[in-house]
Amino acid sequence: GAISLLRGGLSEGLRFPDFEKALTRCALAHYNDFGHSLIYTSKAAVLIDRLGESVATPLLLSLVRSLVYATREDLIPQFRRYGEALDRWGERGNRDSVSADDLMGMGVNQALDLTGDACRAPVIELYDALLGANAQNMLAYDLYYQNQTHRPVQDNVGWLDFSHGLTFANAVRLQCTKFPELWPQG
């Protein structure tokens, strides 16, 4: 399957940049692995650049294997409407702009609806609004919630939720700047 195709491409002399768009598209599919797939894809390029081509094959094999086995987060209740929102991207578009303040206090479904409604806005404006909302949530974070382990998983919030959001946002910006048609998935 995927590993065989990768090995074939590598044996033909293809390198990471030749695979990067397909890997990015795969990483963004279904909000795979809560965004970790995209983070790993963006960091693979950095590692290969810093450590040299000798690490490319084992790194690509590991990355592709992780993409094949990635969990589809669009199947869990909190993110179930993600696929529908992507399918409808560009259909609504009745807002020309969105800000971080517009997103404050929203749940996942409300945020999906709002970003879908604002799909005509410049993508970097949508990105900045989502990143800004994450930053505002971080500033207003109450440690009380982190210590409430008796609550349902969706109500457990810790510092990892914020730092992961920032790391994922950075990966989205890096990869979607290279491949702009993938911004809606990011």
Which residues fall in each region the model found?
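Mature, well-folded catalytic/scaffold domains that follow N-terminal targeting or propeptide regions
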Residues: 1-186
